[in-house]
Design a protein with these regions (language model features):
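GST-like domain detector, emphasizing the conserved glutathione-binding G-site
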Residues: 2-118
Length: 118
């Protein structure tokens, strides 16, 4: 009998990009994942085969049970929620969930750009 891991995800990754954090998180979670590496220098993110997966042509992106999830903060939240037993994110309904989300999105919208754009 074959069993399926309903938490299996496919990560579309490009080295030296924001997808490195998602790859590190998958490892930290001990997640079951398949890795597809894109070469941004050769424009693989703009080829039809990848645009069929992610019409925005950006990385990182994951596919989980047929659903596409993109954007770094959304990916971190989604994956932490997919593996609640790791305790990496407060559960929905936990009083710390709001502050957790605030700092997570502050990082992606304010802190990281300040570091990258200086």
């Amino acid at each position: 009998m074959t069993t399926t891991n309903t938490r299996h995800v496919t990560l579309f990754h490009a080295p030296q990009s924001r997808s490195g954090g998602v790859l590190a998180l998958l490892e930290e979670l001990g997640a079951d994942y398949e890795l597809h590496v894109l070469d941004l220098r050769h424009g693989e993110q703009r080829k039809d085969v990848y645009l069929a997966v992610n019409p925005m042509g950006k990385v990182p992106a994951i596919v989980h049970e047929g659903a596409l999830v993109t954007e770094q903060g959304a990916l971190y939240t989604y994956l932490a929620d997919l593996y609640p037993e790791t305790g990496l994110a407060p559960a929905i309904g936990d009083r710390l969930r709001g502050p957790y989300l605030r700092w997570l999105f502050f990082y992606g919208s304010s802190f990281e750009p300040a570091l990258v754009n200086r």
